[in-house]
Amino acid sequence: AVRNARNAPPKYSDHVETKMITPNMRLYEPKGSQDQRLPVLLYLHGGGWTFGSINSCGRFCDALAASGKMRVIALDYRLAPEHPYPEGLDDCISAVNYIIDHAAELHIDVNHITIGGDSSGGNLALATALSETCRGKIESLLLFYPVTKAFDDGSESWKQYGKGFGL
């Protein structure tokens, strides 16, 4: 039930076209931009690596694409525990390669690829950008409260919140 709580498809704006370009990737593009080569943001949803979907970040992706300045691709990467590490990360790396390989048909400027995400999605975005396969292919990162460490570092935050449910 928790996994499906944030999985309802969102209502999209009238300024954006959406379509599934693969079984696990949704493209958001500004209406009327189909022939323009635009930068792209590959967005990875949060959810503790165990829940969430491309629907849980749909409204955000739609709003970014509605700005008219970029295409956004949301990825439905494989979730733990059914798909242990590094399967989700492998999906992210494969998505970057897909974007590059299909840039012409998607009207994407391969010199302006951004990868981003929130929470665990931010972690995957950072790990993807740092991967040997993707290093040098990604221009920028858009990270919202990314998980960058998960160990007792002695900080006040860890002392106060380090026990119990982490996410």
Language model features by range: what are they?
Residues 8, 13-167:
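Alpha/beta-hydrolase superfamily serine-hydrolase fold, recognizing
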Residues 1-8:
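N-terminal targeting or regulatory segments adjacent to alpha/beta-hydrolase or S9 domains
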